[in-house]
């Protein structure tokens, strides 16, 4: 999962890109990068770290130009610890191209071999974004008929990308001296939208992963870029758009609405906040069928993205809603912890209980989802230590039983607490008195009701159905092997959690 921004203006764009990345910081906290273009020259700065840490005044001054793009990185392919794999990526031909990408290519290894053996292009990192950039460069080189570059040439190149590339990809790219290109995979798995505004009194076109990045920088949201569609904005600010996929279906990742996106964003016509309220409503029916409401004294959310679901659940059941956990926002990230003992300590550093809300009560804790189960187990124990008589746990999402291959770096199947276990076995593993999950079809109905025009969802981590149709057991095995290689490269012990999905919720940004 990453966050991307691209801007075409007649005034300097470095500050706008920076501001947009801050608004998307929840989508990536490992690295950040910005590229601007002045004339035919690119100016780039990228490094590991959060946006505020990577870009100082001197770095911003070194990013001139009226066109640019940026990315915050949360790696799902390649080496999360390599600064070389921070985006954007650059190639010098044709024209000069810079690209940032949100998603994950499921045929990256095949493409890498094809690029070397057939297209005679060299890939210098393990990043699938560099692979995608070189595929785009090769296709653009094939379609170009000489200067000036036409929108038709650009769209023909994107059609070539769609034919070759599998997986999820929302892309923003710069073509030196010509303009900005944005496109989305044929299933629209990862979000991308476009809007317009003013920058120092001049017209601006902006694309971004989420609508909140447009609104927070003073831009008007125009629309979502359609699955398979490409949008080309020339240096004059003229917007050209064309459908470039032979067959496109709108099937966004449902986990965006469950956890990943900010609640104040609207993705593919669906308010993320309203989606989470709806999940709370459907969850209420599941709770009633498992635990009589009379046996629940209080409903407490596990911060932060579960709050809308928890408030709706409490409202419908007529049970008091209370804040029982306080999050320490100044503790470092807990994404990678060597060993269970350190992970437990990190949870208690990140969250602290308000004991008076637990003492002598039967509490229902509400979380957005349960992935590994380690954090849930520790939180349940914290509630017991605070004096709770009984601790029930409800998940606004169904059991996460399958790995995600489309840009969410979840644990391998064996590390997922729900993989191969019944709900009762999961309950015993976590240690709660009752465990209530959302059901898959209920989740889909709750969110799809907000935009019936959707063709469906990628809900692969819940139902094991991979919408691109190319994911096999071998694909999963290769992913597991890659994760093991990553753990070996960083020299950690066998208990290292190389997944990036963990306690810090998106709403911290």
Describe these PLM feature segments.
Residues 203-210, 249-250, 334-348, 393, ...:
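Flexible glycine/proline-rich, aromatic-decorated loop/lid segments
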Residues 135-152, 303, 311-333:
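Amphipathic alpha-helical
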Residues 316-363, 374, 401-411:
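Short, glycine/charge-rich flexible loops or terminal/linker lids adjacent to PRPP-binding catalytic cores
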Residues 130-135, 321-332, 429-447:
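A conserved beta-strand->alpha-helix junction
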Residues 1-227, 232-297, 302, 390:
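Conserved short alpha-helical segments that host acidic/polar catalytic motifs at enzyme active sites
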Residues 162, 177-179, 184, 203, ...:
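PRPP-dependent phosphoribosyltransferase catalytic core
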């Amino acid at each position: 999962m990453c966050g991307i921004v691209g801007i075409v203006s007649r005034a300097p764009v470095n500050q706008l890109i920076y501001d947009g990345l801050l608004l998307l910081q929840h989508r990536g906290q490992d690295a950040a990068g910005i590229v601007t273009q002045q004339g035919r020259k690119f100016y780039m700065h990228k490094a590991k770290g959060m946006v505020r840490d990577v870009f100082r005044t001197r770095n911003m001054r070194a990013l001139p130009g009226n066109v640019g793009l940026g990315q915050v990185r949360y790696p799902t392919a390649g080496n999360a610890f390599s600064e070389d794999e921070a985006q954007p990526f650059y190639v010098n031909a044709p024209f000069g191209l810079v690209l940032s990408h949100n998603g994950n290519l499921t045929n990256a290894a095949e493409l890498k071999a094809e690029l070397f053996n057939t297209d005679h292009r060299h890939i210098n990192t393990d990043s699938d974004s560099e692979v995608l950039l070189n595929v785009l460069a090769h296709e653009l080189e094939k379609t170009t008929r000489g200067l000036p570059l036409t929108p038709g040439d650009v769209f023909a190149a994107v059609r070539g990308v769609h034919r070759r590339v599998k997986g999820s990809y929302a892309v923003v790219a710069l073509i030196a001296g010509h303009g900005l290109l944005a496109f989305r995979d044929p299933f629209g798995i990862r979000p991308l939208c476009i809007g317009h505004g003013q920058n120092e009194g001049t017209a601006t076109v902006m694309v971004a992963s989420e609508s909140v990045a447009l609104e927070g920088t003073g831009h008007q949201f125009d629309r979502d870029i359609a699955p398979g569609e490409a949008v080309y904005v020339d240096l004059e600010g003229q917007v050209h758009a064309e459908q470039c996929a032979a067959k496109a279906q709108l099937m966004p990742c449902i986990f965006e609405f469950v956890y990943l996106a900010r609640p104040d964003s609207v993705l593919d016509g669906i308010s993320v906040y309203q989606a989470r309220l709806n999940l709370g409503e459907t969850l209420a029916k599941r709770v009633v069928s498992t635990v009589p409401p009379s046996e629940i004294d209080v409903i407490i959310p596990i911060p932060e993205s579960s709050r809308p679901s928890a408030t709706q659940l409490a409202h419908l059941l007529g049970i008091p809603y209370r804040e029982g956990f306080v999050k320490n926002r100044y503790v470092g990230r807990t994404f990678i912890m060597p060993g269970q003992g350190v992970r437990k300590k990190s949870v208690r550093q990140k969250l602290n209980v308000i004991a008076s809300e637990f003492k002598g009560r039967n509490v229902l804790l509400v979380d957005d989802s349960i992935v590994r189960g380690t954090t849930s187990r520790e939180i349940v124990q914290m509630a017991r230590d605070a004096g709770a008589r009984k601790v029930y746990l409800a998940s606004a999402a169904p059991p996460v039983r399958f790995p995600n291959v489309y840009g969410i770096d979840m644990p391998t199947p064996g590390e997922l607490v729900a993989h191969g276990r019944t709900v009762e076995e999961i309950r015993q593993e976590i240690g709660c008195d009752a465990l209530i999950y959302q059901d898959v079809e209920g989740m889909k109905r709750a969110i799809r009701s907000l935009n019936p025009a959707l063709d469906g969802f990628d809900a692969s981590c819940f139902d094991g159905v991979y919408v691109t149709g190319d994911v096999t057991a071998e694909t999963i095995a290769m992913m597991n092997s890659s994760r093991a290689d990553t753990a070996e490269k960083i020299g950690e012990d066998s208990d290292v959690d190389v997944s990036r999905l963990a306690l810090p919720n998106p709403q911290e940004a």
